[in-house]
């Protein structure tokens, strides 16, 4: 499609408001998915924070890789009712204009295409078995005189942590319900070397797994002082971490600023305690990480500016700052809840789902972009500022990362933000100037999204 830049006046008119009603975001011509000896004491007050920061030369020239995810939804039922609800998610590279070497792009197209095809086949196999099990379960319940049957459920989502010309890293977020009191959810990290397309091992990134294990154990004790494992002295947790490291079964993601580790329910604590997660940053433990032989800089460091999807209900460390910079975001039906550096914001807005993205700009400012769904399934964007004493709402804008129609109950496609200076959104119907168009945007002043190209615009 033909593209043209909008004038400053038009852009100002387009986004010169903080909130607006929204109808729906139709899908029009969107590209589909194709296919850690010797560190017995860490100073958690971190008095040398500023000096440690200088140890990492984050890249200012690393090319970003634009991705999209595609979730397919299924409802299996018969004349007696619903048996199984399920969905799975694929991930792929969006075609984009890039004049440099094509090899990294093609390599990741192939790698993510292979990943998605494998996951699709695995999902279909699992779906078939679950459907058979659900039929058997319901039949046995009826035979025993019970008329209640809660449909089985299997969900598979993806949250992209990093996407650039060095690393693509994302979380697989799964949930299964097979009857009983509750289902069971968990995450797993997938980390790809963009130059080779192969999945990275922890030993590709860290120099000494024993040192890494000690760092993880100490950080978990610091991050979760009220947890059941900390209250009992941490012995069981330490044994589990050692075992996971020794057996290469640690779940992790390679983020722009370090490595995050994930411990699913029941592994370190009770089901109610949920998923434990912690991050070891390049800047706080630079000696842990593999360095480039020629430049002596950390091999897998990320770009200076980045965007990162945040899974709701996770508490994430964002830096090794003495400020104890942690972020938690969740939602209830009438509010979006954000906790940052110990301060809490309850933003009262009716919603049924959220999809948050953390943004770190070149000048070090942090913002949250949160796509949220109304009860009608229509999505809109709310922006939050994380740079003051407490999080605050910047505004609401007639755009969304949802690239498909909210009325399509079988498919959902999302644009993935990786570069704060260039990312895709789609305008909504209530935008009279350019409704239902793909927008090329950047993060502007105070976190406000600025549009600088509109798909199909003339003039």
For each of these PLM feature ranges, what is it?
Residues 3-26:
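Sec-dependent N-terminal signal peptides of Gram-positive bacterial secreted proteins and lipoproteins
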Residues 200, 392-394:
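A structural motif specific to WD40 beta-propellers
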Residues 26-29, 33-319, 328-361, 372-381, ...:
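Compositionally biased intrinsically disordered regions enriched in Thr/Gly
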Residues 351-359, 399-416:
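Repeated scaffold domains used in trafficking and secretory/extracellular systems
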Residues 42, 53-60, 392, 400-409:
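Sequence termini and other peripheral, non-core segments
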Residues 324, 365-366, 421:
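Short coil/turn segments that connect the beta-strands within blades of beta-propeller domains
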Residues 195, 387-389:
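Short loop/turn segments that connect beta-strands within beta-propeller blades
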Residues 368-370:
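Gram-negative (and chloroplast) outer-membrane scaffold detector with strong preference
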């Amino acid at each position: 499609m033909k593209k043209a830049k909008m004038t400053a006046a038009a852009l100002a008119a387009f986004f010169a408001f903080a909130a607006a009603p929204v109808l729906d975001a139709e899908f029009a011509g969107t590209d589909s998915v194709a296919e850690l000896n010797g560190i017995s004491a860490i100073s958690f007050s971190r008095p040398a924070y500023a000096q440690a920061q200088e140890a990492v030369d984050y890249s200012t020239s690393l090319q970003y890789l634009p991705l999209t995810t595609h979730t397919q939804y299924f409802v299996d039922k018969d004349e007696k009712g619903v048996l199984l609800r399920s969905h799975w998610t694929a991930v792929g590279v969006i075609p984009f204009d890039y004049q440099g070497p094509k090899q990294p792009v093609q390599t990741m197209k192939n790698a993510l295409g292979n990943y998605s095809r494998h996951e699709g086949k695995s999902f279909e196999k699992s779906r078939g078995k679950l459907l058979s099990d659900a039929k058997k379960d319901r039949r046995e319940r009826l035979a025993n005189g019970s008329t209640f049957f809660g449909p089985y459920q299997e969900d598979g989502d993806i949250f992209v942590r990093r996407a650039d010309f060095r690393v693509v890293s994302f979380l697989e977020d799964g949930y299964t319900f097979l009857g009983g009191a509750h289902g069971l959810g968990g995450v797993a990290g997938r980390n790809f070397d963009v130059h080779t397309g192969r999945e990275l091992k922890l030993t590709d990134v860290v120099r000494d797994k024993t040192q890494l294990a000690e760092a993880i154990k100490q950080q978990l004790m610091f991050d979760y002082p009220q947890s059941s494992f900390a209250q009992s002295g941490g012995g069981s947790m330490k044994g589990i971490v050692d075992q996971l490291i020794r057996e290469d079964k640690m779940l992790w993601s390679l983020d722009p600023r370090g490595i995050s580790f994930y411990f699913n329910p029941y592994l370190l604590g009770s089901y109610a305690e949920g998923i434990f997660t912690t991050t070891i940053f390049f800047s706080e433990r630079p000696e842990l990480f593999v360095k480039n032989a020629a430049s002596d800089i950390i091999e897998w460091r990320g770009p200076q500016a980045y965007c990162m999807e945040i899974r709701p209900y996770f508490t994430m460390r964002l830096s090794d700052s003495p400020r104890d910079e942690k972020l938690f975001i969740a939602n209830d039906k009438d509010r979006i809840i954000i906790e940052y550096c110990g301060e809490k914001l309850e933003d009262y807005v009716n919603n049924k789902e959220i999809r948050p993205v953390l943004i770190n700009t070149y000048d070090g400012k942090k913002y949250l972009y949160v796509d949220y769904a109304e009860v009608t399934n229509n999505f809109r964007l709310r922006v939050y500022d994380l740079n003051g004493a407490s999080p605050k709402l910047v505004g609401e804008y007639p755009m969304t990362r949802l690239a498909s129609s909210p009325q399509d109950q079988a498919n959902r496609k999302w644009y993935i933000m990786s570069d704060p200076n260039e990312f895709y959104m789609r305008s909504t119907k209530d935008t009279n100037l350019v409704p239902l168009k793909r927008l090329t945007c950047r993060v502007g002043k105070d976190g406000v999204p600025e549009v600088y190209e509109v798909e199909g615009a003339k003039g």
